[in-house]
A protein has these predicted regions:
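Short acidic/His/Gly/Ser-rich catalytic and metal-binding motifs that mark active-site loops
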Residues: 16-21, 184-186, 229-234
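C-terminal domain-boundary segment and adjacent tail
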Residues: 48-49, 199-278
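Active-site beta->alpha N-cap acidic-glycine motif
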Residues: 2-78
């Protein structure tokens, strides 16, 4: 990898009501949807900072908002796949996963003219319970996955912090984990979500600088609802409410400060500069 190392800002394009692991939820009426306006805020922030990002599009959101993916792509950002229904992969079988992957792919190709080469599972839900994911992704020409988080509870706390290659019957796939802050006891979720909003910005900066010294990209992630502090909320258990909405400050100023300090590039371009996955 070159020095200074490029980092990546990734956006999981879903709406305020897309929360994993809750049943019986219906899609709210269209007038309450916020994703288009919030993505617009993120695009404006990126334009001000002259930065390009990777947007993991939820297929159902792209289908219901057909102007969204073309608008993002027209700004020079990468369009990748976040699946279709925002269902944990542990609740799918291989065929259901394949069907969702291809359904989202067809939608994004029709809307943007480009086939996605990257994938991220809802809530980092690639795990030993889903050993078939890598094979399906590689079979359908995906170059990278960003679904394994080196964290407890939502990933594998002992998993690698840096990108690594996975051999499959259909070729090699890059796995690109999100940034975490290592401590003596546990890795901390400093790259996005509640951790990014809660921990001191100085700690996040120091972690990015550590990744730079290790010659590895720091991968940050953002949800559109995180630039909408006054947006609607679901009624959730205390733990899920904290994870989804806790410390509900506007993440945009923090993201802006990091974009102005460090180099960022879309994951697709980052992977293209690495050793061949063929």
């Amino acid at each position: 990898m070159s020095s200074p190392v490029n980092n990546a800002l990734t956006v999981d394009v879903e709406d305020w009501y897309h929360v994993c692991g809750i049943g019986g939820q219906t899609v709210p009426p269209r007038h309450s949807w916020r994703v288009e306006a919030n993505v617009g805020k993120i695009l404006a922030l990126l334009e001000r900072c002259r930065c390009r990002a990777t947007f993991f599009m939820l297929g159902s959101v792209a289908e219901s908002n057909p102007e969204l993916a073309p608008m993002i792509s027209a700004k020079g950002h990468e369009i990748a796949s976040h699946g279709y229904s925002h269902t944990l992969l542990s609740r799918m079988d291989p065929q259901q996963f394949r069907d969702e992957l291809l359904r989202t792919e067809r939608i994004l190709i029709e809307q943007t003219g480009q086939r996605p080469v990257g994938y991220r599972a809802p809530q980092w839900s690639v795990s030993p319970l889903t050993p078939w994911v890598d094979e399906v992704l590689a079979e359908h020409g995906y170059l990278y996955d960003s679904s394994r988080s080196p964290l407890p509870f939502v990933g594998d706390a002992s998993g690698p912090r840096h990108p690594f290659r996975i051999a499959t019957a259909h070729g090699v796939l890059w796995e690109i984990p999100p940034m975490v802050t290592p401590t003596r006891l546990v890795n901390l979720p400093s790259a996005g979500g509640w951790g990014f909003r809660l921990f001191p910005l100085a700690m996040v900066r120091a972690t990015i600088e550590r990744y730079q010294r290790e010659e590895s990209p720091a991968v940050l992630y953002l949800h559109p609802r995180e630039v909408d502090p006054d947006g609607p909320r679901l009624r959730l258990s205390p733990l899920k409410r904290f994870a989804a909405y806790g410390t509900r400050a506007d993440a945009a100023p923090r993201i802006s400060a990091l974009l102005e300090r460090f180099r960022f590039t879309p994951l697709r371009e980052m992977v293209a500069a690495w050793p061949s996955v063929s």
